C-alpha cells in the first residue's frame, strides 16, 4: 500500500504546488491523476519518489516513510518505484536493450553498470519485457531511430525491468497521437494487472482516463477536489476540477479531434480494451 499524508510542497516566493494532499492506494490499483496545467500532478508524482523534495508531510510505502530516508536508503527504496516519463528519458545513442537494462542500475555497482556487465538473468528479463511491449525485434536498434510510441514502450519495459511494486507514470501519452495513446494505455493496464502493480498515472486526456482508470483523483491548485470512480466524474465534478471555462475548452478540443477522425472518446477506448 502507498499512503500519502498531508503532503505539501512550497517553492521559493511562497508558491504552493501541493496543499496537504492525502491519499491511500492499494496494491494492484491503477489511479489516474487529472487536473488543469499547474494543478500539481507532476509535482505529486515526483514528491513520492523524491525527485522533488516535499516541504512537509509523509509518504508511506510498505511501512517506510520515504521523506525520512537518507540518500543511501532512498536509493534502495527507489528500486521499488518504476518511473515512466512524458519525454521518454531514454539515452538516444544507446540501443533499446541497453536502455531497458538501465532500469537495473540501482541494483549494481558503478563499474558493473559502466561496463554494462549485467547478469544473464537480467538480460533474459529485459528480453522478456521487450517481447511484452512488442519491440523484441528492435532490441539492437538505437533509441533515436524509434517512433514516439516505440520510445514510450521502451520506457515501460525499462520501468518494469526494475521489478517495482509501484509505477509512477507522468503524462505517458502527451506526445502521442490518439490511436497510439490508446495502445500505450491498454498495454500499461495489462502489465499492471499482470504484475499486480500499484500505479499512479498523470494523464491529460479525460476520456482516456475515464476509459482506462479504475479510480480517478482530480487536483486543482494543489488540492484534491475529486476522488472516485470514473462513473462519478460528471459535468459538475469536471467543472470543479478544471473550472468552467477550461472544461468547456477541453470539451471543444475533444469534439474537434473526433470530427477529424482522431477520436479519443470513451467508446473508442472501451472498444480497444474489449478488442
Curated annotation (Swiss-Prot):
<feature type="domain" description="ABC transporter">
    <location>
        <begin position="2"/>
        <end position="246"/>
    </location>
</feature>
<protein>
    <recommendedName>
        <fullName>Phosphonates import ATP-binding protein PhnC</fullName>
        <ecNumber>7.3.2.2</ecNumber>
    </recommendedName>
</protein>
<keyword id="KW-1278">Translocase</keyword>
<dbReference type="InterPro" id="IPR003439">
    <property type="entry name" value="ABC_transporter-like_ATP-bd"/>
</dbReference>
<comment type="similarity">
    <text>Belongs to the ABC transporter superfamily. Phosphonates importer (TC 3.A.1.9.1) family.</text>
</comment>
<keyword id="KW-0918">Phosphonate transport</keyword>
<dbReference type="GO" id="GO:0005524">
    <property type="term" value="F:ATP binding"/>
</dbReference>
<dbReference type="GO" id="GO:0016887">
    <property type="term" value="F:ATP hydrolysis activity"/>
</dbReference>
<dbReference type="InterPro" id="IPR027417">
    <property type="entry name" value="P-loop_NTPase"/>
</dbReference>
<keyword id="KW-0813">Transport</keyword>
<dbReference type="Pfam" id="PF00005">
    <property type="entry name" value="ABC_tran"/>
</dbReference>
<keyword id="KW-0547">Nucleotide-binding</keyword>
<comment type="function">
    <text>Part of the ABC transporter complex PhnCDE involved in phosphonates import. Responsible for energy coupling to the transport system.</text>
</comment>
<dbReference type="GO" id="GO:0005886">
    <property type="term" value="C:plasma membrane"/>
</dbReference>
<comment type="subunit">
    <text>The complex is composed of two ATP-binding proteins (PhnC), two transmembrane proteins (PhnE) and a solute-binding protein (PhnD).</text>
</comment>
<dbReference type="InterPro" id="IPR012693">
    <property type="entry name" value="ABC_transpr_PhnC"/>
</dbReference>
<dbReference type="GO" id="GO:0015416">
    <property type="term" value="F:ABC-type phosphonate transporter activity"/>
</dbReference>
<dbReference type="InterPro" id="IPR050086">
    <property type="entry name" value="MetN_ABC_transporter-like"/>
</dbReference>
<keyword id="KW-0067">ATP-binding</keyword>
<dbReference type="InterPro" id="IPR017871">
    <property type="entry name" value="ABC_transporter-like_CS"/>
</dbReference>
<keyword id="KW-0472">Membrane</keyword>
<dbReference type="InterPro" id="IPR003593">
    <property type="entry name" value="AAA+_ATPase"/>
</dbReference>
<feature type="binding site">
    <location>
        <begin position="35"/>
        <end position="42"/>
    </location>
    <ligand>
        <name>ATP</name>
    </ligand>
</feature>
<keyword id="KW-1003">Cell membrane</keyword>
<keyword id="KW-0997">Cell inner membrane</keyword>
